[in-house]
């Protein structure tokens, strides 16, 4: 099965550029929703013996998705700026993060911390799954750039959703 080419063109040409992301149509996968995209990422990236780091508190269903894959899951406490990169346990293979509007704290990860997270991922060969949850709900300041827009080494998988904007 193939995604609707017109929808993919709109995502590539209009939606993702608003987040600072340039992607070719063949780099875009339309799923049934963000939770389905997180499930797919877990299926592809994790399994027994693999390690994932998630935010604490964070999206409750994510922990269940990762546990079902048999991955070791480390819950990293967030602070007022979101997930602290230096608190991610050594040996993590994948980090799941909501940098633009952390749920449930609503913390927004500052640019310096985003850069530090990307540097840590590069140095330790980690992948990052960015759940761009609720980015458009930033009413006090312009939306922060997507983590994927800062990624120069291909370590970030961006998960976006239309559910809050439709």
Regions found by a protein language model. Give the residues of each.
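PLP-dependent aminotransferase class I/II
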Residues: 157-166
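Conserved core of the PLP fold type I
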Residues: 1-124, 136-157
